[in-house]
């Protein structure tokens, strides 16, 4: 691969091009992905995050993969929004074991007005500890997005899950365009985007390629791209889906790395089902971020000490916390606020 090819970041990928990447011989694909990875990252550093469920279960969405959906009987005990102090205690614990980013997830269709003040206090408190902050709260409106940005939220997670064509087979309570709109609000507010998808839901190769195309062809690539392997939970409609071929999963990571060379590609849900050899291949394919700890929201994750033992055997070290230019972040927020105020001054006759 030429130096000029490595330096080019694209936003115009076609389905034919991406499928051709998937269909390369395995070794060729991994070589291309690893070459791209080394052009932008230290191949022996992996970003480490901890994920905490701050509100569990009884979600009104009908995502067929999710044990938190109120539509399915999975035996999951629902819990109300966690107290702010408890969240901060968990964040301190995460920092103590080596995490540099603390992600907070709530099983909501969207956050309510009464819950937003508590959510904002969580962001401010975790940020004050010196951790990067990330949240996944469902769909956001512009006002909520700006409030999160002003509180200091670094990343917002909102996955696209799959291709637009397959999406309706998995979720009916939220549209694909609504997901894209939330991502646009997040970007306009000056925050960073975490967005990816899930393998193993019965999707085709075209759907896997289509998901990556949606992400890679955004105006700016997501800074973080979580690639999840379906965790099959009894009671959900996808509990009996066939397992993903491990090599197909590695191919997905490799193609994500090639399409979005500057993004962190996260080895996310399903890592509990992966042996050490598969995880090592994932890092070779360009994965450079993991969730660290015992749970991913409601499903098991490899224990923290096992992760560090594997890192030691592979010569991998946790990535240091990314330092943000606060003045740049603040400038983006201020610009977004100005644009919102300006838009409120104009009456749209077409909407009447």
From Swiss-Prot:
Cofactor note text: Binds 1 [4Fe-4S] cluster. The cluster is coordinated with 3 cysteines and an exchangeable S-adenosyl-L-methionine. Binds 1 [2Fe-2S] cluster. The cluster is coordinated with 3 cysteines and 1 arginine.
UniProt cross-references to PROSITE patterns, sorted A to Z: RADICAL_SAM
Classification via InterPro entries: Aldolase_TIM (IPR013785), BATS_dom (IPR010722), Biotin_synth/BioAB (IPR002684), Biotin_synthase (IPR024177), Elp3/MiaA/NifB-like_rSAM (IPR006638), rSAM (IPR007197)
Gene3D superfamilies (UniProt xref): Aldolase class I (3.20.20.70)
Top EC group: transferase
Keywords (A to Z) from UniProt: 2Fe-2S, 4Fe-4S, Biotin biosynthesis, Iron, Iron-sulfur, Metal-binding, S-adenosyl-L-methionine, Transferase
GO biological process, one term: biotin biosynthetic process
Catalytic reaction equation(s): (4R,5S)-dethiobiotin + (sulfur carrier)-SH + 2 reduced [2Fe-2S]-[ferredoxin] + 2 S-adenosyl-L-methionine = (sulfur carrier)-H + biotin + 2 5'-deoxyadenosine + 2 L-methionine + 2 oxidized [2Fe-2S]-[ferredoxin]
Binding site for [2Fe-2S] cluster: 103, 134, 194, 266
Transmembrane stretches, start-end: none
Residue numbers binding [4Fe-4S] cluster: 59, 63, 66
Domain Radical SAM core: 44-262
Domain of life: Bacteria
Function: Catalyzes the conversion of dethiobiotin (DTB) to biotin by the insertion of a sulfur atom into dethiobiotin via a radical-based mechanism.
Stated family: Belongs to the radical SAM superfamily. Biotin synthase family.
Protein name: Biotin synthase
High-level lineage: Bacteria, Pseudomonadati, Pseudomonadota, Gammaproteobacteria, Pseudomonadales
Gene: bioB
